[in-house]
């Protein structure tokens, strides 16, 4: 994921948690914060409760790939995505569908593109 698409600083994460709103499904919690920019920025969080480092890194890779696929349809806001335990059992296509579902629930899904 390109640097300009990432939330990196603690203050950026805290702003999204504090001022944004959250939407969830069984696999993911997504915090959204409206922002004036041309593309979205995202921060990923996978707790140590979800498994060892290999499993957590796999989950982050799946989430990043799903975001790459969903990019044209996601509104240009700031997001923090937190993975829940059931997400570790999902395949790539299931992760993509689950994130798409939670983005639609958050009303940030823009129908267009690919």
Swiss-Prot record:
RNaseP catalyzes the removal of the 5'-leader sequence from pre-tRNA to produce the mature 5'-terminus. It can also cleave other RNA substrates such as 4.5S RNA. The protein component plays an auxiliary but essential role in vivo by binding to the 5'-leader sequence and broadening the substrate specificity of the ribozyme. Consists of a catalytic RNA component (M1 or rnpB) and a protein subunit. GO terms for biological process: tRNA 5'-leader removal. Its EC number is 3.1.26.5. It comes from Exiguobacterium sp. (strain ATCC BAA-1283 / AT1b). One of its GO terms (molecular function) is 3'-tRNA processing endoribonuclease activity. This is Ribonuclease P protein component. Keywords: Endonuclease, Hydrolase, Nuclease, RNA-binding, tRNA processing.
């Amino acid at each position: 994921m390109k640097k300009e698409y990432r939330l990196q600083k603690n203050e950026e994460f805290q702003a999204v948690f504090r001022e944004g709103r959250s939407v969830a499904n069984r696999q993911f919690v997504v915090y959204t914060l409206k922002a004036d920019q041309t593309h979205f920025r995202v921060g990923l969080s996978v707790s140590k409760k979800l498994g060892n480092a290999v499993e957590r890194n796999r989950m982050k890779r799946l989430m990043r790939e799903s975001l790459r696929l969903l990019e044209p349809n996601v509104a240009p806001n700031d997001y923090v995505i937190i993975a829940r335990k059931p997400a570790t059992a999902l395949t790539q296509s299931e992760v993509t569908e689950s994130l798409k579902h939670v983005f639609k629930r958050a009303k940030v899904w823009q129908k267009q593109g690919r």
